[in-house]
Amino acid sequence: MSLQPVQFGDEGQVATRELAVRYREACLRDARLVALRPGFDMLEAIDRQYGGSRRLELEDTDELVAGLLNDLARLRAEPELALGVALWAMRHEVEMGAVEVVVNALAQRSNNAKSPQELSAVFGLMQGLIANVTPLLSADLERSNPERPWRILHINFAITAIRTEDPAMMDFAFDALDEALPGERGGFYSEALALVLAPGVAPAVRERIEARHLKWTAGR
């Protein structure tokens, strides 16, 4: 029988404390980050008072999150810090006004993932981010900008799903992309199909991409 350590606080509070530890360690490597301590302290203080995983009705929490994310992006801080702040916002259903740095952090984590389990975890985080930012970005008002976070997030979501080779995840991500980026569906599946024709790609992956490609390019 193995002994399990006792944790104080709910899972959200534990995650926020772990973020605080990562932040303090990052400060030792980059002294510029010390200026952000009031914001990180506030995340912990809110968790202590309201719990770590509940919707917040507090004023200015969205500004707190956006400020931290913008500062982390400006200082080019370690991506995991931005991801930690974003996860705090997701747990509390706080809208994120600064999305690009989080999208980039998730892309890096996806690129570094080596196992199906790691890819599935990134998939879940991307799914949560899409749910959080949909009210803010779903109008997709910057369609002329190929680097806009709404587009990059959905493209990365679909690519991560393909890498999992999980049919259900691919179907979910493809449905999300089809709805979010109607003008780019055909192009995405054309490029994806060219890649999955290589040997060694699972049949389920190829079949699903072929079906979407046919759906959105037939009759062009």
Language-model region placement:
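N-terminal alpha-helical scaffold/docking segments in eukaryotic complex subunits
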Residues: 1-67
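Repeat-mediated protein-protein interaction surfaces in helical alpha-solenoids
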Residues: 1-2, 80-89, 126-143
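Residue at a conserved register position within TPR or TPR-like alpha-solenoid repeats
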Residues: 26, 109-113, 161-162
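Long amphipathic alpha-helical segments with strong coiled-coil/leucine-zipper propensity
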Residues: 52-127
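Amphipathic alpha-helical scaffolding segments
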Residues: 104-105, 124-128, 172-181
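Alpha-solenoid repeat scaffolds
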Residues: 117, 129-136, 168, 183-187
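Alpha-helical oligomerization segments
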Residues: 146-220
